[in-house]
Design a protein with these regions (language model features):
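Juxtamembrane interface at the ends
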Residues: 231-238
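"…together with the soluble PPM/PP2C metallo-phosphatase catalytic core" -> "…together
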Residues: 1-231
């Protein structure tokens, strides 16, 4: 592992503190919220910058200063979902627009995979949209969302492919910003981003390894507790 790949985590940490010093979004307490005071939000932008920097470094190293469509489409999807999340943080987008945007972004993200069967594409879109929304639902509960992302990325990275482990360092750097005291929330920009990342990693992960069938099952196992807890909470709440 090249030492340069630590840079994205440092960039995430720095951008996180820049967002704290110069806030672009504020989360105001609500009846359903877990916080009582205004908290700086949209921390997902720091994570996005870290992911982009990692992708650039990895792309330049792997492809000798060139990028494949995979990287371009993947980053585009992450950027779009983060932007949608940011506007939802600051302007409260309508449910129909959010849902439509999530479906479009999910379909775009699937262009980075080898899925071609219409039924599987539909199932994958449902998984991605659902994962985005449960991440959004569970965000803000004692760093639960970012902690699960760290666990998922680190575990899948150690088991299957190292790129995911590098993502865990980016997530960890954001976690450390809020370690002793919450300074900045992920916001919808961050929860949407993490949801898309996790879902696409589950769907596309098997193609990166010789353990194709076992990989898909294993990736789901890594997220089982989070999926079950979030689903149960949603059912119990409504």
């Amino acid at each position: 592992m090249d030492i340069l790949y630590i840079v994205p985590a440092l960039i995430t940490y720095i951008v996180g503190y820049i967002l704290i010093k110069y806030p672009i979004s504020i989360s105001v307490p609500t009846e359903r919220g877990m916080h009582k005071n205004n908290i700086i939000s949209s921390g997902g932008i720091a994570i996005l910058v870290g992911i982009i920097s990692f992708t650039v470094l990895a792309g330049l190293d792997k492809y000798s200063s060139s990028f494949h469509n995979y990287e371009i489409i993947y980053i585009s999807a992450l950027m779009l979902v983060t932007i949608i999340g940011y506007f939802d943080d600051t302007r409260s987008l309508s449910k129909k627009f959010r849902f439509g945007a999530q479906i479009f972004i999910s379909y775009l993200a699937l262009q980075t995979t080898s899925i071609s069967d219409p039924f599987l594409i539909l199932a994958a879109i449902i998984l991605i949209v659902y994962t985005i929304n449960i991440y959004n639902f569970m965000d803000g509960i004692d760093q639960l969302a970012i902690s699960q992302a760290i666990f998922f990325a680190a575990s899948s990275g150690l088991i299957f492919w190292w790129e995911n482990f590098m993502f865990s360092l980016i997530f960890l750097s954001f976690f450390l910003i809020n370690y002793k005291k919450t300074k900045i929330f992920l916001g919808n920009s961050g929860s949407y981003l993490l949801g898309l990342y996790v879902a696409v990693a589950i769907i596309s992960g098997p193609r990166e390894t010789i353990y194709e069938e076992g990989a898909l099952i294993s990736m789901f196992i890594l997220m089982t507790i989070f999926y079950v807890e979030a689903t149960y909470t949603i059912i119990a709440r409504f």
